Amino acid sequence: ASTCGNMQLYSLIVTQDRALREALSPCHFNQPMVVEAPCLVTVCADVHRFTMWCEQRDADPAYDNFAWFLNAATDALLAAQNLAVEAEMHGLGICYLGTTLYTAERIAKILELPKGVVPLTTIVMGYPDESPELTDRLPLEAVVHYEKYTDYTAAEIDELWAEKEESELTRRLLAENGLDNLAKIFTRNRYRREDNLAISRSYFELLREKGFFNQ
């Protein structure tokens, strides 16, 4: 994968041991695939390894700050997506787990992450028993801008989400959640304000603990 300065500021922790996957399972809300799939990959931003190399060469590293967390996070997520694409090309199924950010402090303790290393996401990997339908996406014009950012009108927002909002899946979700539109499923049930703030505070504290907020 592309990497800042060819520094490879990431680590991929491959967990195949069942006991360790069972220990990590509560961090991912006990989703069955965490234990049932044969391989769990925790993707980490990592300035620790490069910092050690610099120090052992009498160089003065300065990567214990937020700018280099962002560089390391970019490196790590680029590597993660390349791993996911390569796995799928070889017939494996993958699933990203956003729960990593929810419980990053606990994951860091279980995986014994040193200073300068924080978890970003987790990929569950294995040979699938089924072939689920592809998840729908917004049309390309929703995410591609030419020359400059082009803001959206209210009518354009309606048009971009129309297919999602009219799908059978959305109708089923609205019935299950007792809500009148898809947006409220996200804001009231899936990603609530109070949860978002709690996760943010927890992750900022982990970044501070791991040395990414030094001035």
Regions found by a protein language model. Give the residues of each.
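Acidic, surface-exposed loops and disordered segments
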Residues: 1-215
